[in-house]
């Protein structure tokens, strides 16, 4: 447990050092204003950071990947398109089968050294975020294999989570204390 704590402290210090020198390129705010995702660039590396209710939740965390066709580990921000997205969907294997969402959808385009685009689509809601990578199809490329994913989740030491128990009740606690 002590080694894990030391490693987590080292990661937190590295993440904090990135925050000092990174330049914010885009911000995505949830419709209710509670969640903010900042996307930053530092020495051709892309990071995202999450604040919730004015408190830092996720320290700067790396984005990027390396595939058999393209290297998206060093990127330059190109553009962002944002829109509000609302809707409902059903899940047939869940306690809550009907789900609704109200998010800010942001499509960010990045370019690598070879001029190839990587698209990262964020969905930012009041209590959640999600993102996914898109690699635009070029030529006859039928499939792409991912060799390395650089995606990180550098949680702040004081970040809280909700841990439900079997009764549906639960507790809020920091990530280190649960």
Spans of model-derived segments:
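N-terminal accessory beta-strand-rich subdomains and adjacent acidic, glycine-rich linkers
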Residues: 25-178
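Boundary at the C-terminal end of the N-terminal hydrophobic targeting segment
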Residues: 17-22, 26
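Positively charged n-region of N-terminal signal peptides that target proteins for export
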Residues: 1-3
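Bacterial N-terminal signal peptides
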Residues: 6-16
């Amino acid at each position: 447990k002590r080694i894990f704590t030391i490693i987590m402290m080292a990661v937190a210090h590295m993440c904090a050092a990135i925050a000092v020198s990174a330049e914010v390129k885009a911000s995505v705010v949830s419709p209710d204003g509670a969640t903010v995702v900042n996307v930053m660039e530092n020495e051709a590396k892309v990071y995202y950071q999450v604040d919730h209710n004015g408190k830092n939740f996720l320290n700067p965390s790396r984005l990027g990947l390396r595939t058999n066709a393209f290297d998206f580990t060093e990127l330059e921000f190109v553009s962002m398109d944002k829109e509000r997205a609302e809707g409902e969907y059903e899940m047939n294997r869940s306690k809550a089968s009907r789900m609704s969402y109200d998010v800010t959808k942001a499509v960010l385009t990045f370019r690598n050294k070879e001029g190839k685009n990587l698209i990262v689509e964020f969905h930012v809601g009041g209590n959640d975020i999600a993102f996914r990578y898109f690699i635009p199809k070029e030529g006859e490329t039928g499939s792409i294999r991912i060799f390395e994913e650089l995606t990180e989740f550098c949680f702040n030491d004081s970040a809280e989570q909700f841990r439900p128990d079997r009764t549906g009740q639960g507790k809020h606690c920091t990530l280190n204390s649960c």
